[in-house]
Amino acid sequence: MFRRLPFLIPIVVFTGALVAVAPLDAFAATSPNLGTALNFTALAGSTVTNTGPSVITGNLGLDPGSSVTGFPPGTVTGVTHISDAVALQAKNDLTTAYTDAANAPVTTDMTGLDLGGKNLTPGVYKFDSSAQLTGTLTLSGNGVYIFQIGSTLTTASNAVVQTINGAQACGVYWQVGSSATLGSATHFQGTLMALTSITMITGANIISGRAMARNGALTLASNHIVPPVGTCTLGSGGGGGNGGSGGAGGPGTVGTSGPVPVPATGAGGPGLLVPALMLIIGGASIEAARRSRAVAVR
């Protein structure tokens, strides 16, 4: 066939080259839309309980529960909203963000693996059941990271989530199907969204991120929770702001809403790659048909 249709060889080679250089992140995840929940560092559904000198940098919200205890000795630097319209809206927006994260197309199945010792690039990582972090998880590269966890998330003592090579905590999301427990002295990053509860053991810190328990309790013990600061810029495009930490006057300003796309890098992205492939394949088919007819006529 190729002796009759030698013109196909460079077409096939060129098409393969296009596919080879297509950026993997052209189809990457988008940030879940936190909406007004972006204004909160901590949210819970039933109760918020604290022991020790915990510090929540920013706003604290609770809805529909009404029990917030342990402040003082704990400190909330922003505003505490308990079962009011602001907390209700933030919880509704959290539900939307949680669903967005849960429905993101999976890029890697990590079921049964420990996150410790892994070096991951932007993507959507799925655990069918529980997930554990023992040691250090390294997130490398600017973009969106979503962890879909079917049941529980547990970190061991002294576990670390670190970001390098442009990775930002504002682009990291943990969607947990039941409850999350951060072990003592854990250094965690990202927005932690648990369907049920979040427990932070003594000395565990979220050094850049949020703790958001949709339906259950947030339990603290001498912890620090600090939201991402500055403008969240993912890839070469701009993401939404991280929102203010709030103050005596009310919650901070919501950053730009909507999912934040991770733009493709390199030549074309999907917007140019797919039409180019269609043109090449279509042209090859037409030329093949024309030459076949010419051979038949001879």
List the predicted regions and their residue ranges:
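Glycine-centered small-residue hotspots that permit tight backbone geometry or close packing
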Residues: 123, 265-266, 282-283
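Extracellular Ser/Thr-rich, low-complexity/disordered mucin-like segments
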Residues: 248-275
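Bacterial N-terminal signal peptides
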Residues: 9-20
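A cross-kingdom C-terminal cell-surface attachment/processing module
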Residues: 270-293
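Bacterial N-terminal signal peptides that target proteins for export
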Residues: 1-10, 269
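Solvent-exposed adhesion/ligand-recognition segments of exported proteins
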Residues: 23-255
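Actinobacteria-biased recognition of intrinsically disordered, low-complexity terminal regions
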Residues: 1-2, 293-298
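N-terminal zymogen propeptides
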Residues: 14-15, 24-28, 266, 278
